[in-house]
Amino acid sequence: MTEPDSKPKKGRAGRKKAEPVRPPEQFLELAELLDYVGQVIARGVPGGVWVRAEIASLTDRRHLYLDLVQAGEGGAGGVGEVAKCRATVWARERFALEAKFRGATSGATLSAGLKVLLFGTAEFHPQYGFSFNVLDISPEYTLGDAALRLEAMRAELVAEGSYGLNRLLPVPTDFARVAVIAPREAAGLGDFRREADPLEAAGLVEFHYLEATFQGREAGASLLRAVAAARELHQEKALDALFVIRGGGAVTDLAWLNDLELARALATFPAPVVTGLGHARDDTLPDEVACLRTDTPSKAAAYLVRTVVNAAAQAQEAARTIRAEAARVLVEAEAAAAWARDRALSSAVRRVDAAAAEVDALMRQALGLTPQRTLARGYALVRDAAGQPVTRAAGARAGEPLTLEWSDGSVPVRVE
């Protein structure tokens, strides 16, 4: 008899029942783990630190809730982000912090897209995760960062030769067809149209209004689309100018206009660009490349109206000058015609008188040459037998009878 195989048989009948695995006897509760992470962060980042980042988004609910990002080479907005976290500005710090920022930046407010330098503490909460509690801000960093980026863009435009192109165009001396880029229903646009609408109603200027966003991440792309639309209008029929206007705002709001592609589009625009962006002290890159800069939409409109009025006044003055010059030319022409007429008349009279005198002299001469007059002066007339005058010696032949005639009678003679 064969000994039974000591190895377990394959198949369901031959499987041994698995021994249950006992759970580890040592483990951490989730709260304990997260508490431990919080302690590590607290020990690793003691006290407050200055952190440089960009505000990706901001929510205002009495407290300010921010999403901070650090962008890599790909830029912000989810492309090329190398770090991201939540940050909070509690109400007790918020109002002092915002007042400080507004005071240093001429009224700017914290908004998405700003590069900021924040002072605060790192905190990790088991329920809410990591957060950066903001206690202070350095407005000078935000302004300095904007200035550095502006200088870099300016240098690039200068290097490629487009920076001063629009400023080389002649400053408009009159306006008949104008494109205007402005935010929709903005107060600045209303100020502009109060001055411009009467010109359009009078048929003096044709306006084309193009809407664009001047703040936020979409500002650059929106303004580029508006400039492209203005370029198409110019290709259809030449524009006298492109006005780019917006109402007043904080200095940092102007940073959205410091866009390289926008500045390049304005610098190379085929018609003069006039800006009125709401700030007298602070220039933007569009202000720098424009043919003409004004402070506000109202001043831009005033410039337009003043130019049209001056052109009309110059046209009226030119018309008056033309009328006066035409009248002067007519008077001089009439005087010249009268002088020429008098001169021609006097010349004709002199010629007629001279001709009459000459005729009279000829008549007297002719009358003085008649035979009777000649005979009366002592001459004698020789006639042949037929009674014809003999004027040459050859006509007197020998033996032929002739007659000598004087004024008082005649005597027959014969030639020997």
Curated annotation (Swiss-Prot):
Protein name: Exodeoxyribonuclease 7 large subunit
Role noted for this protein: Bidirectionally degrades single-stranded DNA into large acid-insoluble oligonucleotides, which are then degraded further into small acid-soluble oligonucleotides.
RNA-binding as UniProt keyword: no
Record's keyword terms, sorted: Cytoplasm, Exonuclease, Hydrolase, Nuclease
Organism: Deinococcus radiodurans (strain ATCC 13939 / DSM 20539 / JCM 16871 / CCUG 27074 / LMG 4051 / NBRC 15346 / NCIMB 9279 / VKM B-1422 / R1)
Segments of this protein annotated with the region Disordered: 1-21
Similarity comment: Belongs to the XseA family.
EC number: 3.1.11.6
Gene Ontology CC annotations of this record: cytoplasm; exodeoxyribonuclease VII complex
PANTHER family in the record: EXODEOXYRIBONUCLEASE 7 LARGE SUBUNIT (PTHR30008:SF0)
InterPro entries xrefs: Exonuc_VII_L, Exonuc_VII_lsu_C, OB-fold_nuc-bd_dom
Disulfide bridge partners, by residue number: none
Subcellular location(s) per record: Cytoplasm
Chief localisation class: cytoplasm
GO MF annotation, one: exodeoxyribonuclease VII activity
The UniProt record lists the keyword Nuclease: yes
Subunit comment: Heterooligomer composed of large and small subunits.
Top-level class of the enzyme under EC nomenclature: hydrolase
Catalytically driven reaction(s): Exonucleolytic cleavage in either 5'- to 3'- or 3'- to 5'-direction to yield nucleoside 5'-phosphates
GO biological process: DNA catabolic process
